[in-house]
Amino acid sequence: MHYARIVSNLRLGYDIIHMAEYVTLTTNRKAFHNYFLEEKYEAGIMLLGTEIKSLRSGRVNMGDAYVKPQRGELWLVNAHISAYECSGHTSHEPMRERKLLMHRKEIALLMSKVKEKGLTLIPVRIYLKNDIAKVELSLGRGKKLYDKRDTVTKRDTERELEREVKYRNFRR
């Protein structure tokens, strides 16, 4: 797999396959553009076998995904996990709602913050942690149009400064 690396153990004389602890599969880039992200939380996700295989091959899109609370549970909605090509007719539905796994106290805390402060719960990225799929959730406050413009101009000025510094160092 693309995220495994082999670690040689010279004393014992064999190779150990060491899996990377965190492997990011996808990020929700719209979330960084549309929200001020504040606190981060980790949640497990209930997936079918074909879904985890599609995730590992990188066939997932979280562009319009959001988290919906329902009867004391959290559900990931509009996350598109493509059908696994080798599954045949037993494949999963790509746009189905997927249950997020968290402790009840954590869910209650998140829901109280969402109701009280006017924050939104946004899925930021899906990653593998020791071969288990996890979703990083973040509490976010929506940006206004002028906030989005400010972040774009700040990013552009930082890029220009980096280019100038790089150019000056190159000329010496």
From Swiss-Prot:
Keyword Cell division recorded: no
SUPFAM superfamilies according to UniProt: Small protein B (SmpB)
Cellular location(s): Cytoplasm
GO CC field: cytosol
Superkingdom of the organism of origin: Bacteria
Keyword RNA-binding: yes
BP GO terms, sorted: trans-translation
Pfam family for this entry, one: SmpB
Example GO molecular function: RNA binding
PROSITE patterns: SSRP
Entry keyword set: Cytoplasm, RNA-binding
InterPro entries given in the database record: SmpB (IPR023620), SsrA-bd_prot (IPR000037), SsrA-bd_prot_CS (IPR020081)
NCBIfam families (UniProt xref): PRK05422.1, smpB
HAMAP family the record matches: SmpB
Membership in a protein family: Belongs to the SmpB family.
Function: Required for rescue of stalled ribosomes mediated by trans-translation. Binds to transfer-messenger RNA (tmRNA), required for stable association of tmRNA with ribosomes. tmRNA and SmpB together mimic tRNA shape, replacing the anticodon stem-loop with SmpB. tmRNA is encoded by the ssrA gene; the 2 termini fold to resemble tRNA(Ala) and it encodes a 'tag peptide', a short internal open reading frame. During trans-translation Ala-aminoacylated tmRNA acts like a tRNA, entering the A-site of stalled ribosomes, displacing the stalled mRNA.
Protein name in UniProt: SsrA-binding protein
